């Protein structure tokens, strides 16, 4: 890597760490100063990332060796390819505006210093994943992301539901990370390197072992909340809404998709097929479940799960370029939707039930305009940001597998249905509660990010697709996208138009009665099936009926063998026997005797090993 680029990446990576340390040491009680310091650093990083994105194309590397174990080298370095540059810009740009939104949203919070310090350490962690050039470095930053997200979700730790949600997210992610670390060990044992470039150059004749890809895929399943480890994401909405926008829309959950795109060459056809089927199924299921949520943030959480499934399906179809493109577009409009939800919650005095809202379009016009624009992009309205990437994935699925295309088509329809429901219940019709009746527009620090991300990038990012698509993938993606713009008979376009038409009908359907969920009233059984948390119930049964009994049995063995045989019999019996044979007790309470015993024992062990 050229010196100017290496120094640029150093600044991008370590500026947020410096901000976090400074806040932790000096600004914990100076919340306003901490907020603006963290926000200023975030905008500086975004400017540097933009400079990097617009620099000369090509893959650049920088690496320093930290340790050498035999033939194995462990180091710290950067791999800056087109995907990494794009991700650096998207993460830092979206995060900068979320920081500004947080200045207004968290204005009255007594723990602002801790909150913004957590945002900065999270930025450091996620940017480390983006630039890492090896699996071990990726894993270190991966765990830092888990730690910082735990802190941010538990910001309201005095509330039981927030504390429980943070623990749930942390534990469920550790399950996926177990597979990740086993994959790292497997890779090290078989190939002797963890460096992405060196692994890419190996290309074994017999193909990559399927187990390697399957183990590394576990990290993606946990971090990107895919089935069956998706249960933590909706509970994570217990954190402040800007956290939901940053971690659970734009960065953390997308990190798993980015990681899979980074290691796509390690995935065998069997693993790719599993990723595709799992992703498409998750997209359809999560989209339907969003129809049965009354909490605005949880509805958006299921929407995020659906889009992550679409990205996973793109990876499985062998199109990581499309997955990365959709990840970028999704970050813009989904961050806008979460920030819009935060503005609504702030304006409605912390009310989150959509059935208790309504009529906010008149009282919150800027929020409404940005939210509707992002919603249209979420629904893949032609020529908006979401359309360019989502329809390209649908087209790739149609060309590859009809079953996957059907599942993704169902997800597209569900997206339009829950989006129409959300907009209708929140912004139109009469006010359904006193909180909605007295709602007010948010301050400029909260509306400015909505205008930029919602009315700006959620709408216009699609027109800049050529600039956002990684250069190496331009020929594979840009031309089909241009062609689709003028071919209304493509399967993806037809599905998209049908979904939009059904969304328009849903908008009328949900406006029949104020403050009432029409689907629950007309189809209570179907609504109940979608609303019921099946996997949480299954995990609860497993922990209570299976795992608890296993741990009780292990505790019995520990009491019998470890505490009984090893500690009591050996620990107490051996000194007693030696004391009986020597005629004196070994425990006399004199420090010099213990020191003498330690020295003699050490000398005997040294003599034994040297004499072998």
Describe the residue ranges of each PLM region.
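N-terminal signal-anchor/start-transfer transmembrane helix
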Residues: 13-28, 96, 221, 283
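Membrane-interfacial helical/loop segments at transmembrane boundaries in membrane proteins
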Residues: 60-73, 197-201, 392-396, 467-486
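Transmembrane helix-loop-helix hairpins at membrane boundaries of multipass inner-membrane proteins
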Residues: 1-8, 21-117, 190-204, 231, ...
């Amino acid at each position: 890597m050229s010196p100017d680029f290496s120094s640029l990446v150093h600044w991008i990576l370590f500026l947020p760490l410096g901000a976090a340390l400074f806040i932790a040491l000096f600004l914990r009680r100076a919340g306003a100063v901490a907020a603006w310091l963290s926000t200023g650093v975030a905008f500086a990083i975004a400017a540097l990332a933009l400079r990097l994105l617009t620099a000369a194309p090509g893959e650049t590397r920088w690496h320093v060796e930290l340790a050498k174990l035999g033939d194995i080298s462990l180091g710290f370095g950067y791999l800056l390819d087109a995907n990494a540059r794009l991700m650096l810009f998207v993460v830092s740009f979206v995060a900068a505006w979320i920081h500004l939104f947080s200045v207004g949203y968290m204005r009255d919070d007594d723990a602002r210093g801790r909150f913004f310090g957590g945002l900065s350490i999270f930025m450091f962690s996620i940017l480390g994943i983006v630039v890492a050039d090896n699996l071990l470095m990726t894993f270190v930053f991966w765990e830092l992301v888990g730690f910082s997200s735990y802190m941010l979700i538990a910001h309201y730790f005095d509330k039981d539901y927030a504390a429980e949600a943070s623990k749930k997210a942390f534990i469920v992610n550790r399950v996926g990370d177990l597979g990740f670390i086993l994959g790292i060990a497997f890779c090290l044992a078989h190939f002797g390197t963890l460096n992405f470039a060196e692994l890419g150059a190996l290309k074994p004749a017999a193909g990559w072992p399927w187990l390697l890809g399957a183990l590394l895929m576990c990290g993606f399943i946990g971090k990107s909340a895919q089935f069956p480890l998706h249960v933590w994401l909706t509970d994570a909405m217990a954190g402040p809404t800007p956290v939901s926008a940053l971690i659970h829309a734009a960065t953390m959950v997308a990190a798993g998709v980015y990681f899979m795109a980074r290691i796509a060459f390690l995935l065998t056809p069997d693993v790719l097929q599993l990723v595709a089927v799992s992703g498409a199924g998750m997209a359809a299921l999560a989209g339907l479940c969003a129809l049965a949520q009354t909490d605005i943030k949880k509805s958006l959480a299921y929407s995020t799960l659906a889009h992550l499934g679409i990205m996973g399906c793109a990876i499985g179809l062998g199109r990581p370029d499309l997955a990365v493109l959709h990840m970028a577009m999704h970050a813009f409009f989904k961050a806008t939707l979460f920030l819009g939800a935060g503005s609504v919650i702030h304006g409605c005095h912390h009310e989150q039930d959509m059935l208790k809202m309504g009529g906010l379009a008149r009282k919150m016009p800027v929020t409404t305009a940005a939210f509707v624009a992002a919603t249209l992009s979420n629904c893949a309205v032609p020529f908006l940001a979401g359309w360019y990437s989502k329809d390209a994935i649908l087209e790739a699925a149609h060309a590859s597998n009809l079953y996957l295309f059907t599942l993704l088509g169902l997800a597209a329809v569900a997206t339009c249905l829950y989006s129409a429901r959300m907009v209708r219940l929140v912004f139109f019709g009469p006010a359904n509660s006193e909180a909605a009746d007295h709602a007010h527009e948010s301050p400029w620090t909260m509306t400015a990010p909505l205008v930029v991300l919602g009315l700006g990038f959620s709408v216009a990012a699609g027109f800049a697709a050529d600039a956002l698509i990684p250069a190496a993938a331009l020929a594979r993606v840009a031309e089909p996208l241009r062609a689709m713009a003028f071919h209304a008979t493509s399967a993806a376009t037809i599905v998209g138009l049908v979904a939009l038409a059904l969304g328009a009908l849903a908008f009328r359907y949900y406006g029949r009665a104020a403050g009432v969920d029409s689907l629950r009233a007309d189809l209570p059984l179907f609504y109940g099936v979608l609303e019921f948390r099946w996997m949480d119930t299954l995990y609860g049964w497993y922990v209570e009926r299976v795992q608890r009994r296993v741990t009780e049995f292990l505790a019995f063995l520990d009491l019998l063998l470890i505490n009984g045989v090893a500690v009591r019999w050996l620990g107490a019996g051996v000194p007693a026997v030696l004391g009986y044979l020597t005629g004196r007790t070994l425990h006399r309470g004199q420090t010099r005797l213990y020191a003498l015993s330690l020295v003699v024992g050490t000398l005997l062990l040294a003599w034994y090993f040297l004499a072998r």
